[in-house]
Amino acid sequence: MGNLVTHLLDRLFGKKEMRILMVGLDAAGKTTILYKLKLGEIVTTIPTIGFNVETVEYKNISFTVWDVGGQDKIRPLWRHYFQNTQGLIFVVDSNDRERVNEAREELMRMLNEDELRDAVLLVFANKQDLPNAMNPAEITDKLGLHSLRNRSWYIQATCATSGDGLYEGLDWLSTTLKNRSKK
């Protein structure tokens, strides 16, 4: 009964639920971001084999965030998480210049998947606190984001350990998805 009341109140007051898939190469900071958003603190992480899933409440939206491991051997499993994904968060290690082309290839491969054709894209240009980090404009260029047609996308500079930029990214995601659901 309590769940029914909560569900009705959520519907009355416009609480939205959104399924978000967070991917990126290994060591980009996905798990650190997930738990910074969920717990507000830095947690010690180990490479994710499989996935972590958490619900993050923000601005009357319940984001179900799937953080999927990024090691090359398990990237083929990403597609198993595509169904019903409304938003894709692609996390890039802004300091990893050697692998930015690999990140681009993985991103473009995913964006060509039919199941993700309607998903909006948020890129977290993570690790901006590091001295040699590429800025968002450089990452936009290296990922080829300007070539994307018929897809809403946004890039946000972030630092997972301090939390800088994370909520700005969620703001864009929530606004974009809310506007889309009104159509």
Curated annotation (Swiss-Prot):
First-listed, main subcellular location of the protein, grouped into a coarse class: Golgi
Q: Return the protein name.
A: ADP-ribosylation factor
Q: Which InterPro entries match?
A: Arf1-5-like, P-loop_NTPase, Small_GTP-bd, Small_GTPase_ARF, Small_GTPase_ARF/SAR
The record lists its disulfide bonds as: none
Q: What biological function has been recorded for the protein in this entry? A: GTP-binding protein involved in protein trafficking; may modulate vesicle budding and uncoating within the Golgi apparatus.
Question: Which Gene Ontology MF annotations are present?
Answer: GTP binding; GTPase activity
- Which Gene3D superfamilies does the entry link to? P-loop containing nucleotide triphosphate hydrolases
Q: Which source organism does the UniProt entry give?
A: Dugesia japonica
Similarity field = Belongs to the small GTPase superfamily. Arf family.
The residue range of the signal peptide is: none
Q: Does the keyword Nucleotide-binding apply?
A: yes
- Compartment(s): Golgi apparatus
Name the residues that bind GTP.
24-31, 67-71, 126-129
* A Gene Ontology cellular-component term: Golgi apparatus
Which Gene Ontology biological process is one annotated for this entry?
vesicle-mediated transport
Q: Does the keyword Transport apply?
A: yes
Q: Which UniProt keywords apply?
A: ER-Golgi transport, Golgi apparatus, GTP-binding, Lipoprotein, Myristate, Nucleotide-binding, Protein transport, Transport
Q: Residues bearing covalent lipid (N-myristoyl glycine)?
A: G2
